[in-house]
């Protein structure tokens, strides 16, 4: 066959509407905004080409392989309702394009290069379908939801956490004292903030030691298992693992990682260490909004959430629906199901473009955190259910009587909501009444209710369904 040099349109090779997807294909749904004058078929084909085998011109080495076997294919295009220039382009990638067990390689291929492409005004990856054949090459979360409950001996209610504030500036001893007060008052976990690593005012080893002391002292007082998310995120993978090793030697139950700033390679390494050494792994999503906030460009958080479940983490921050951070209810619950459940049906009303079968990969507990307080407890309990961590930073430490009473208020509120739900009451309709009733016999809760009775974060969500 003679080699024919020159430039030809992508759609001649990469737009294949007749293609029937295979069970082993990775499927992607891209929101494509082509430049004026670029037809959607060409734009969709360009995305498929540039994120798989294509380049801008025909090359003679194409003849040395089977492009039909390895190329990505744009197999369907739908206009986005209400937008004149946006399309959802569906692309199928053969599994052989990806290294086994590597989220890093998956993202480098699918979103690594194509987002700077000149023929596109904007591009957003809305969803991925990960086939079971690829999922089986990943370890996934170190332990999963059921194992975590068994380790902690806590059942039938959401878990409670608190991020220690001020996030930066406390000495290690004062930091440990704040943890102790919260844990003693009734919380299950306290937490390092995402940017607490090892700074001049508090080196990591000192913090780990004082927090371990807080854990053991509060456990002895309450008879409950306690934890503090010790942030092992560091400048190098070796240093990160060193911190995780020290946490294990202290006998604490859980460590933490910032998975986007730390990177997927580091995160997967830490997840493997945590499974091998019995540590739970809490994941913070710092930097996610840089990637997922714009509606027409970037990557939706549901993709980052799926990637985290593959890479490994037992908890991940997922927004609150009711607090100070972005998150619309249906969309949030869509990716919360993708984190927790074994099988999730396609449901476009919740932003789920593909049916996803996780083939027994352990689940991840969603963490609701950011601007929430006791008045939100009924809504949070109803929205997230038992398999969640509800995290109140300011909502614990901002209590007028201090940390421990703040923790008591949150624990009383969550127990009251769970009891009311189990008795068949409607948390959405009767939530305020349930909290008021509980506050009659808990002065700590009554004081918290008084402080935050008028606090609301009323802004419309940016991330809405079309």
From Swiss-Prot:
The modification N6,N6,N6-trimethyllysine is found at residue 4. Mg(2+) binds at residues 191, 193-194. It is found in: Plastid, Chloroplast. GO terms for molecular function: magnesium ion binding; monooxygenase activity; ribulose-bisphosphate carboxylase activity. It holds the Pfam family RuBisCO_large. One of its GO terms (biological process) is photorespiration. It is an enzyme of class 4 (lyase). InterPro entries: RuBisCO (IPR033966), RuBisCo_large_chain_AS (IPR020878), RuBisCO_lsu_C (IPR000685), RuBisCO_lsu_C_sf (IPR036376), RuBisCO_lsu_fd_N (IPR017443), RuBisCO_lsu_N_sf (IPR036422), RuBisCO_lsuI (IPR020888). Its EC number is 4.1.1.39. Keywords: Calvin cycle, Carbon dioxide fixation, Chloroplast, Disulfide bond, Lyase, Magnesium, Metal-binding, Methylation, Monooxygenase, Oxidoreductase, Photorespiration, Photosynthesis, Plastid. The keyword Manganese does not apply. The disulfide bond which can form in the large chain dimeric partners within the hexadecamer appears to be associated with oxidative stress and protein turnover. Its main location: plastid. Substrate binds at residues 113, 163, 167, 285, 317, 369. It catalyses: 2 (2R)-3-phosphoglycerate + 2 H(+) = D-ribulose 1,5-bisphosphate + CO2 + H2O; D-ribulose 1,5-bisphosphate + O2 = 2-phosphoglycolate + (2R)-3-phosphoglycerate + 2 H(+). Its cofactor is Mg(2+). It comes from the Eukaryota. The keyword Protein biosynthesis does not apply. CDD domains: RuBisCO_large_I. The modification N6-carboxylysine is found at residue 191. The basic functional RuBisCO is composed of a large chain homodimer in a 'head-to-tail' conformation. In form I RuBisCO this homodimer is arranged in a barrel-like tetramer with the small subunits forming a tetrameric 'cap' on each end of the 'barrel'. Belongs to the RuBisCO large chain family. Type I subfamily. PANTHER family: RIBULOSE BISPHOSPHATE CARBOXYLASE, RIBULOSE BISPHOSPHATE CARBOXYLASE LARGE CHAIN. RuBisCO catalyzes two reactions: the carboxylation of D-ribulose 1,5-bisphosphate, the primary event in carbon dioxide fixation, as well as the oxidative fragmentation of the pentose substrate in the photorespiration process. Both reactions occur simultaneously and in competition at the same active site. This is Ribulose bisphosphate carboxylase large chain. It comes from Ruttya fruticosa.
């Amino acid at each position: 066959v003679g080699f024919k040099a020159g430039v030809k349109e992508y759609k001649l090779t990469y737009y294949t509407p007749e293609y029937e997807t295979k069970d082993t294909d990775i499927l992607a749904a891209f929101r494509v905004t082509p430049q004026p004058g670029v037809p959607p078929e060409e734009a969709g084909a360009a995305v498929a080409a540039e994120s798989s085998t294509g380049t801008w011109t025909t090359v003679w080495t194409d003849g040395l392989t089977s492009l039909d076997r390895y190329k990505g294919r744009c197999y369907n295009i739908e206009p986005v309702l209400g937008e004149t220039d946006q399309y959802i382009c569906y692309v199928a990638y053969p599994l052989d394009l990806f290294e086994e067990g590597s989220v890093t390689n998956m993202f480098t291929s699918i979103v690594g290069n194509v987002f700077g492409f000149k023929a596109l005004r904007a591009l957003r990856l809305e969803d991925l379908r990960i086939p079971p054949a690829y999922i089986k090459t990943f370890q996934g979360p170190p332990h999963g939801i059921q194992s975590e409950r068994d380790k902690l001996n806590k059942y039938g209610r959401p878990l409670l956490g608190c991020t220690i504030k001020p996030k930066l500036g406390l000495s290690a001893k004062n930091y440990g004292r704040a943890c102790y007060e919260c844990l003693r008052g009734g919380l299950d976990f306290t937490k390092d903030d995402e940017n607490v690593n090892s700074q001049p005012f508090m080196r990591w080893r000192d913090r780990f030691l004082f927090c371990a002391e807080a854990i053991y002292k509060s456990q002895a007082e309450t008879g409950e298992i306690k934890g503090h998310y010790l942030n092992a995120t560091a400048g190098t993978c070796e240093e990160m693992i060193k911190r995780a090793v020290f946490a294990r030697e202290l006998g604490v139950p859980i460590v933490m990682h910032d998975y986007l700033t730390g990177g997927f390679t580091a995160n997967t390494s830490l997840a493997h260490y945590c499974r091998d050494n019995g540590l739970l792994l809490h994941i913070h999503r710092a930097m996610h909004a840089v990637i997922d906030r714009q509606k027409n460009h970037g990557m939706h958080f549901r993709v980052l959430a799926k990637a985290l479940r593959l890479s490994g983490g037992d908890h991940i921050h997922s927004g609150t629906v009711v607090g100070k951070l972005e998150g619309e209810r249906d969309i949030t619950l869509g990716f919360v199901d993708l984190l927790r459940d074994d099988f999730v049906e396609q449901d476009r009303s919740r932003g789920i473009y593909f049916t996803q079968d996780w083939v027994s990969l352990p689940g991840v507990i969603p963490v609701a955190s950011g601007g929430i307080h006791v008045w939100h407890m009924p809504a949070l309990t109803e929205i997230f259910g038992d398999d969640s961590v509800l995290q109140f930073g300011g909502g614990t430490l901002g209590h007028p009587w201090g940390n421990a009473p703040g923790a008591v208020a949150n624990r009383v509120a969550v127990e009251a909501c769970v009891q009311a739900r189990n008795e068949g009451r409607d948390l959405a309709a009767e939530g305020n009444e349930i909290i008021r009733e509980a506050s009659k016999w808990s002065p700590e809760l009554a004081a918290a209710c008084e402080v935050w009775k008028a606090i609301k974060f009323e802004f419309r969500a940016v991330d809405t369904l079309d």
